[in-house]
Amino acid sequence: VGRTARAVWSAIAAVSVLFTAACGGGDAVDTPTSVGDTVTTTVLREGASEAEKVAVIRLCQQVITSAGVMVRDYNTFIKRLNKVQDYKAIGSEDQWAIETLNTGAELVRKAVAPDVPSDVDDEVQRFVTSSERLAEQIQGKRRDALNRVSKDWSKDRTTLLDTCSEYLPAGGN
């Protein structure tokens, strides 16, 4: 199994645990459940309908999975570029990053369902757009623009993941 396949399966397993915790069981949403020393409380956005919650949780599964793989491959590309300082000597790391950013953006875009609230959809579109812009900068070998564009991408990704956290279980001790 290649490195991307392993990472995807690991991310899917982690997201499945989160999804099961968020959607599973017949307990009330606000009821903390104790497993060993960990208490998990589901925190849901105020005023969201059940259909919106389910749609956003499903969307967030894809966001978490895609973002994890995207970050990993982008960071691998940047480490290699910083080491060799030349696109010609980078090997295939730039192509991996481009492919992962574009594929991740497309998978997230396709995961938006009609019940996803418009404010969440707007955040998704910003994340998808900044992912595609970052891929374009890498493909165009525009090193000077990478820092600015990657900061935008990071901000958009963090904003979307923070929104996802409003719909997913929150854990603590």
Q: Residue spans of the language-model regions?
A:
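Bacterial N-terminal signal peptides that target proteins for export
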Residues: 1-12
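C-terminal motif of bacterial Sec signal peptides marking the signal peptidase cleavage site
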Residues: 19-22
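Bacterial signal peptide processing site
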Residues: 24-27
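Extracellular/mature segments of secreted proteins
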Residues: 31-32, 52, 66-71, 171-173
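Extracellular mucin-like PTS domains
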Residues: 32-46
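Membrane topogenic helices and adjacent juxtamembrane segments
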Residues: 44-58
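Alpha-helical segments in soluble extracytoplasmic regions
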Residues: 58-114, 149-165, 169
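Long, amphipathic, charge-rich alpha-helical segments that form helical bundles/coiled-coils
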Residues: 96-145
